[in-house]
A protein has these predicted regions:
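Short alpha-helix
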Residues: 162-177
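Conserved alpha-helix/loop element of class I SAM-dependent methyltransferases that forms part
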Residues: 19-39
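A short glycine-rich, Lys/Arg-flanked "PGG" loop and its adjoining helix->strand segment in the class I
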Residues: 121-136
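A short SAM/SAH-binding and catalytic strip from SAM-dependent methyltransferases
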Residues: 107-119
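A short acidic, Gly/Pro-enriched loop at the edge of an enzyme's catalytic core
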Residues: 98-108
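Conserved Class I S-adenosyl-L-methionine
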Residues: 184-247
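Short, glycine-/aromatic-enriched active-site segment of Class I SAM-dependent methyltransferases
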Residues: 142-160
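Class I SAM-dependent methyltransferase SAM/SAH-binding core
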Residues: 44, 50-98
Length: 247
């Protein structure tokens, strides 16, 4: 398995939500969509991971969903969950957004997947283009909690312009022709649980594969990020889900 997919796949073992948003917060987003959308809508999730957003949406409504993700392991887990929780309601494709038709949806989402769409602004343009007028976009993106200093940026290995502050992120959503309706920010303890679960999974994998060079590489990568997270990321990085209506 490619190191990139292996790192993500192993790190997310046992996790259904592939970002630091808590389960209650995801539920609040689903409730907002269900109560303000049509009774039988269609939802698209690009970079859907294990499709938890789509599954919850279809569990609680008459909606149907389509998700796409390039990670074969995530696709398999998503399909298994759909078979028991939302059979026949959600379709998952293994691949990228390039493979999708130009159909539009009542909801288009990308949670932490803007990199797959060329960055924040191109991702928002793609989501707006995939959403019917009056429909919803759900956009998950990282942001700076406060302006980053040079020392923290060096620890994280990130340029200052890679992310914006939360108000700048919301303004970018607004500028894409989308009316922000709700912003849900990952709580610190949910992010901690996410990070440490990810770390435990990779540590367990390295322990159970002592002679595997890939396992050693993945664990070394995780140790580097653990250090960066504790020294700078925990204080500086935020993650938000933004629900917006297409104008």
């Amino acid at each position: 398995m490619d190191d990139g997919f292996a790192y993500t796949t192993i790190g997310h073992r046992g996790l259904t939500i592939c970002n630091p948003i808590g389960s209650d917060e995801l539920d609040s987003i689903v409730s907002l969509i269900v109560t303000s959308g049509p009774p039988t809508g269609r939802a698209l999730d690009i970079g859907c991971g294990k499709a938890e957003l789509l599954i919850r949406l279809c569990e609680r409504s008459g909606w149907a969903g389509l998700g796409v993700d390039p990670n074969a392991a995530f696709v398999a887990e998503a399909r298994a969950a759909i078979a028991t929780r939302a059979p026949g309601r959600v379709e998952i494709l293994e691949g990228t957004a390039d493979q999708l038709s130009h159909a539009t949806y009542d909801v288009a989402a990308a949670l932490g997947a803007s990199h797959a769409l060329g960055g924040t602004e191109p991702a928002l343009a793609a989501l707006a283009g995939a959403t019917d007028p009056g429909g919803h976009v759900v956009f998950g993106e990282s942001f700076w909690r406060h302006p980053p200093g040079a020392a923290a940026l060096e620890v994280l290995g990130m340029p200052a312009d890679e992310l914006g502050l939360l108000h700048e992120l919301v303004a970018t959503v607004d500028a894409a022709g989308l009316e922000p309706l709700e912003v849900v920010v990952a709580r610190e303890h949910d992010w901690d649980r996410y990070e440490w679960a990810h770390l435990r999974n990779l540590e367990a994998h390295a322990r159970s594969h002592p002679d595997d060079p890939q396992a050693a590489r993945l664990w070394a990568r995780r140790e580097r990020w653990r250090d960066a997270y504790l020294r700078a990321g925990r204080d500086l990085l935020g993650f938000a889900l933004i629900v917006a209506r297409r104008r």
